[in-house]
Amino acid sequence: MLTLSPAVRIYLATGATDLRRSIDGLSALVRDRFSLDPLSGHLFLFRNRRGDRLKILAWDRSGFWVLYKRLEQGTFAWPPEPPGAPVEMSNADLLLLLSGVEIAQTRRRRWYERVA
């Protein structure tokens, strides 16, 4: 399970990405296509054409991480936006995506905390 700071932003690359790319190729993609800094400490998610594989690029002050997930059945529920600027998502949405839940189908309920 991933535990992320609330300050970490999560960017999802729309469209398909050639997942033969590794750290250098994915960080160049973040820098050139999205005009974002791969050394920012934020997470960048990429999906292959079939939709059954996912890579997450992250920087943690001492080096890059690449997390890779391959589904044995099914596909990741990816937003239908055309390739272009990345879509920002919340930590909760990332956990839902990795669990196989289609984010567009979920309905959020409001939660209130008692202040006093």
What kind of region is each of these model predictions?
Residues 1-116:
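Polybasic/polar functional segments that serve as interface/processing modules
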